[in-house]
Amino acid sequence: MKHFSHSKLALIALTLASSFATSGALADYRLTAFSDTVGFKALVDGDLAATKSTFTSHSLKRMDYFEANNLCVAQILLEEFESAITSCTSALEKAETSSELTIKNEKVALASVYSNLAVAKAITGDTVGASVDLEMALSLNQKDGNASINYDLISTNLVAGS
């Protein structure tokens, strides 16, 4: 069973946000990876080649939702956005059948996955879908700083695009 640490989650979210700006479109968005799971160390180290290699040998079907989320983050950083949408969606589906977390921690974790999904959608041009996902993230955890920042960015883009 994986143990979820909110303080580690927040720290990792900030680390990923400040360390990975692979493209102009991605530079301002914030991503969250889960610690103590596949791909985490390579993500934190900023080694995208190692991250990709780590996930190459793993099947999305066999991953739990922590791992599927980290795969989603890796795919966003590697600019494989459609694959990231699939991985984040899978993480959300897997979370529905998981009993690894308490209800409170599950909401915090799900909010992070929805926020990551929203980033992938926004970058592919689906800002309306991204906005809906971020509203869901914030309804699950209104204190999610990454979701708040991402929501503000997407809302600004929606207004500018009107």
Question: Where are these predicted regions, by residue range?
Answer:
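Flexible helix-coil transition and linker loops at the boundaries of alpha-helical arrays
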Residues: 56-62, 93-108
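Alpha-helical segment of the N-proximal tetratricopeptide repeat
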Residues: 30-60, 70
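Terminal, low-structured helical/coil segments at or just beyond the last alpha-helical repeat
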Residues: 127-162
